[in-house]
Every structure is written in C-alpha cells, then in structure tokens.
Amino acid sequence: MLKFLKQVGDYAKESLQAAKAIGQGLGVTFDHMQRRPVTVQYPYEKLIPSERYRGRIHYEFDKCIACEVCVRVCPINLPVVDWVYNKETKKKDLKNYSIDFGACIFCGNCVEYCPTNCLSMTEEYELATYDRHELNYDNVALGRLPYKVTDDPMVTPFREFAYLPKGEYDPHVVPSDRPRAGQRPEELVDQYKQAAAANEEN
C-alpha cells in the first residue's frame, strides 16, 4: 500500500513539473504573440535607411571637372573618367563617366574627396539585376535622382526600426494601429484611400 502511494505521489510530482515546464514555454509564446512582428515583409515593407547610409552613388555631370581624384582614392580604381584636353580653353572636356556597381564596395571615398561635390551617396540600395553588365552605370544612369522608399504608395516604410526615439531600444513599443506585417499592396492602397477620404470629410 505504501509503495502504491509513493508511486502516486511521484507521478503527481512529475506531472506538476511537466505542467510547469509546459506553462513556462507557453508563457514565452504568448508573450511574443502580444508583440508587434519584427520581420519586415520585403518588398511590401521596407526599412528607411539611416541618414548617412551609403547606397547608390549620385553623379552631377555639370559639376565634374575630370580631376580624377575619385579614381585615385578608390581602393579598386573603379570610376572610369573619359575626357579630352581642350586646347582653346586649356581645360579638360568631360566626355563620359561611369561606375561599375558590380565591383563597387560603397566605401564612400570618392564622395568624401570630390573637390566639387559632384558625387553623393543616396539611400537607394536596390541594384539587383539579371545581367551584371547592367550594373555598369554611365553618367546618365548615375545622374538619375534617387528613389525614396517614402515616395512609393505601394510600400509601407518602417521608420521606427531605423529611427528609434532617444533612449528607446525596443522596436516593439510602437502604436498598434500601424500597418502590420503581411498586408498586401492592394490592402495598403485601400487603407490609404479610406484615410484620405476621412481627411477630406474632416
């Protein structure tokens, strides 16, 4: 009889320990269920790059004096500067300027040392292509104005992941009415239309 009672007591003890372990695991799960998802559903949601983000290089043809400082400071001598010497003006006439982003390491040396500030780093980071030759940007492609994430109505920009308030280290502490992960572009467009209609009524 005592042996049986001991077995029942041990079984009850083990059951309580198992229930406690399961409860702890479920507690962690439920805690995460209440939080806002941190996964960015790219390409429908995009992080806004930081202010000094080193993305695609923007080039202004009119400012360039063909000094080739960018070529000298580049670790891999990447920029290609084509120019001819004009004997009348005794200056260089720039013909073409190109950078191969397939080889560029985005170090920013060319931008930092450019004497006329004709080069600048943009926030654009989507340079993927099926053909590597398309990554060789000439002066026309480099002169194209950068595309901002915030200008695209089909994309939800996530500012709070890149710009958290001072002293704030937890991206979960954001308003619950912000668009959540998993929304499709058409849903976002409908949401924006409803918000615009509500603003017009007010």
Swiss-Prot record:
GO terms for cellular component: plasma membrane-derived thylakoid membrane. InterPro entries: 4Fe4S_Fe-S-bd (IPR017896), 4Fe4S_Fe_S_CS (IPR017900), NADH_quinone_OxRdtase_chainI (IPR010226), NDHI (IPR004497). GO terms for biological process: photosynthesis, light reaction. One of its GO terms (molecular function) is NADH dehydrogenase (ubiquinone) activity. Binds 2 [4Fe-4S] clusters per subunit. [4Fe-4S] cluster 2 binds at C74, C104, C107, C110. Keywords: 4Fe-4S, Iron, Iron-sulfur, Membrane, Metal-binding, NAD, NADP, Plastoquinone, Quinone, Repeat, Thylakoid, Translocase. Its cofactor is [4Fe-4S] cluster. This is NAD(P)H-quinone oxidoreductase subunit I. It comes from Synechococcus elongatus (strain ATCC 33912 / PCC 7942 / FACHB-805).
